[in-house]
């Protein structure tokens, strides 16, 4: 499975797909993260084994990240469109190489209802770093499309940061 940094038309297609999934901007840690300003890692269509010439826009997975807060790189969005095939794991594993030298930590946020994501990240070495009670409630003032209830019928209220030291 090949992970690559998106450029040109592929970057535009990756950002458009993420915006379709998450809306624009992503609201996290009491700030707006415009996906249009993020870099993106991509995995092509894994059913085709990432053959050269993958058509832009046919993604098995995408990871948007920001280097704005050096020495911490922020994962702004992660989507594996082909579940349980190692796509998310491959994207996260490739990220340290792509953020470059001088970065000491990767950080991401998820919501309190996203128990599957919490398990996924912790099994890959990420650790819990912060809890922001009411952060999602505050985010709804900027982005009203955030649902009130999420996975497993849990109310979505809080954000949880996870970090991975490099």
Where are these regions (language model features)?
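Acidic/histidine-enriched, glycine/proline-rich intrinsically disordered or flexible terminal extensions
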Residues: 143-166
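Extreme N-terminal starter segment of soluble prokaryotic enzymes
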Residues: 1-3
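Acetyl-CoA-dependent GNAT
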Residues: 5-83, 89-93, 98, 165
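Conserved active-site alpha-helix within GNAT-family acetyltransferase domains
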Residues: 89, 112-151
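Conserved GNAT acetyl-CoA-binding A-motif
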Residues: 99-112
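Short secondary-structure boundary/hinge segments and terminal tails
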Residues: 36, 75, 100, 116, ...
């Amino acid at each position: 499975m090949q992970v690559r940094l998106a450029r040109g038309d592929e970057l535009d297609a990756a950002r458009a797909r993420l915006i379709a999934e998450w809306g624009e901007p992503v609201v996290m840690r009491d700030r707006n993260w415009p996906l249009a300003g993020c870099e993106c890692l991509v995995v092509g269509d894994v059913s085709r084994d990432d053959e050269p010439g993958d058509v832009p826009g046919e993604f098995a997975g995408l990871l948007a990240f920001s280097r704005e807060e050096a020495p911490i790189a922020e994962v702004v969005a992660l989507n594996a469109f082909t579940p349980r095939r190692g796509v998310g794991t491959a994207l996260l594993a490739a990220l340290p190489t792509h953020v470059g030298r001088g970065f000491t930590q990767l950080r991401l946020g998820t919501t309190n209802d996203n128990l599957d994501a919490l398990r996924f990240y912790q099994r890959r070495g990420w650790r819990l770093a912060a809890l922001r009670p009411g952060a999602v409630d505050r985010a709804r003032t900027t982005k009203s499309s955030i649902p009130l209830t999420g996975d497993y019928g849990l109310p979505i209220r809080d954000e949880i940061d996870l970090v991975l030291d490099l």
